[in-house]
Amino acid sequence: MNAIKERKIVYTSGQIAERVRAMAAEIDAFYGDEPLVAVCVLKGAVFFFTDLVRAMRSENLELDFVRLSSYGKGTSSSRHVVFSKDVDCDITGKHVLIVEDVVDSGLSMQFLMRQFEARGARSLRLAALVDKNERREVDVRDRKSTRLNSS
């Protein structure tokens, strides 16, 4: 027999929407008129990404997408992360904002930041809807900045 666990609402949709708007304002203030590439980590972050970039006021915003895989055969997670889909644009010399739904172990974000850093991104910053610090295996920090999702 399957027992259904009682679910508890952690954040209401209104609270999430307000935080997304606040993050967008933070990002706008931080970058100003600087060109920015916002990279959505598919598939999980797509709705958060859409809401976030719609709330941003930047006119110098380029959108791109990546998809990462950290699973070997079956469903067990591995420490080996690979691209299933890479960005299409050249990020050399550009500010890059990675938008992720949940940062858990940090392995995927560490992989992505190292890849983008090696390609010469001017700066790398992370906007995450949920940051599960308690499950972190590796340190995930913005490059040349402080975290935008610290609230």
Where is each model-derived feature located?
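PRPP-associated nucleotide enzymes
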Residues: 1-147, 151
